[in-house]
Amino acid sequence: MVFAVTVLFNGCSYNFIVPIEVPVIDPDDPDAPQISFANDIIPIFVDNGNCSSCHNGSQVPDLRAENAYAAINTSRYINSATPGESRIYKYCSPETTTHMRKKYNSAQAALVLVWIQQGAKNN
């Protein structure tokens, strides 16, 4: 009995992941922080194999760090007139039903959308 209780209380441990807080950024605010493609968007694509595990050159778009901007900087993926309709945002958004594999979390989706709203610069 003592053994069972010991295993029960010591058998499991949890590492809680604190969600990243992303501030709401108004793209029309001239003082709003600029989203950086290199520092903010590329990590979404490559960290932990998020997107680049599949989109690694064998599947379009190629989202490896060195190729990502050239691969998505087309009207097929970025809709500058209606950023929320951009394929690079909408196809992997948390609410999508079209992309069954990995999706953006809400913080990542917000960063991608604001980056597009700010002009989708290669910065």
Q: Across the structure, where does each feature detected by a protein language model lie?
A:
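Aromatic- and Gly/Pro-enriched helix-to-coil junctions and flexible linker segments
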Residues: 12-123
